[in-house]
Amino acid sequence: MSRRTKKVGLTGKYGTRYGSSLRKQIKKIELMQHAKYLCTFCGKTATKRTCVGIWKCKKCKRKVCGGAWSLTTPAAVAAKSTIIRLRKQKEEAQKS
């Protein structure tokens, strides 16, 4: 039997085609795409991608919309942190 690929991993299916830099980018994206993520509802690491932008937890059966390749996008993380910061400022202003 032949040895499995160590360096190329998932992108071994492309062989020598498309160039090494593009295959490295694809490898990074495909690893994120096929990974399991932490469910925000039940706390288990069971959320997987069903199709583009739709993620489903296998434990609690919840469906969540997110990024195309990863559960959260940088823009969504920035927006969420901004909302949390503004809520804290509003609460502090009401207390004073």
From Swiss-Prot:
- Where does the record place it? Cytoplasm
Q: Which InterPro entries match?
A: Ribosomal_eL37/eL43, Ribosomal_eL43, Ribosomal_protein_eL43, Ribosomal_zn-bd
Please provide one cellular component term from the Gene Ontology annotations of this protein.
ribonucleoprotein complex
Q: Where are the zinc fingers (C4-type)?
A: 39-60
Q: What is its main location?
A: cytoplasm
Q: Which Gene3D superfamilies match?
A: 2.20.25.30
Kindly indicate whether the keyword Ribosomal protein belongs to this entry.
yes
User: What GO biological process terms does the UniProt entry carry, in alphabetical order?
Assistant: translation
Q: Which keywords fit this entry according to its UniProt record?
A: Cytoplasm, Metal-binding, Ribonucleoprotein, Ribosomal protein, Zinc, Zinc-finger
Q: Name one GO molecular function term.
A: structural constituent of ribosome
The record's Pfam families line, in alphabetical order, gives: Ribosomal_L37ae (PF01780)
Has UniProt tagged this entry with the keyword Chaperone? no
Q: Which family does it belong to?
A: Belongs to the eukaryotic ribosomal protein eL43 family.
The task this protein performs is described as: Component of the ribosome, a large ribonucleoprotein complex responsible for the synthesis of proteins in the cell. The small ribosomal subunit (SSU) binds messenger RNAs (mRNAs) and translates the encoded message by selecting cognate aminoacyl-transfer RNA (tRNA) molecules. The large subunit (LSU) contains the ribosomal catalytic site termed the peptidyl transferase center (PTC), which catalyzes the formation of peptide bonds, thereby polymerizing the amino acids delivered by tRNAs into a polypeptide chain.
Assembly: Component of the large ribosomal subunit. Mature ribosomes consist of a small (40S) and a large (60S) subunit. The 40S subunit contains about 32 different proteins and 1 molecule of RNA (18S). The 60S subunit contains about 42 different proteins and 3 molecules of RNA (28S, 5.8S and 5S).
For this entry, the protein name equals Large ribosomal subunit protein eL43
| Organism the protein comes from | Plasmodium falciparum (isolate 3D7)
Taxonomy of origin reads: Eukaryota, Sar, Alveolata, Apicomplexa, Aconoidasida
UniProt lists the gene as RPL37A
